C-alpha cells in the first residue's frame, strides 16, 4: 500500500523533508499524524512492520569495500539526487550526466 511504501522510502532515504511533508499532508492528510508519517498504525500487519523495519539506509544498500570509498560517496550522492522525495527537486538528466560520479576516471576504479 502507499503508506507502507512511504515508510519504506523513509527507512532508505531518511525522513520526508518538512516542505515536502507539508505538501503531501495537503493531498493525503490520512497518511500523517502530528506532522509525521502515520506508520505503523494499530491495524498494520506484523508482516508489514517487519518488512519496513528490514529496510536499510541507502548507503548500506550500496555498500562497497574501502577501496571504492571515493566512488561509493559519489555514487550515493548521485542516487540521493535521483531519488529525491520531491519530484521538483530531483536531478534532471542533464544534471545527472554532469554529476561528479560520471567525472571519475574509470582507471581509478580498483580491479
What are these regions (language model features)?
Residues 2-6, 55, 72-76, 90-93:
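Generic preference for well-ordered alpha-helical elements
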Residues 5, 34, 71-73, 99, ...:
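Histidine (H) residue identity feature
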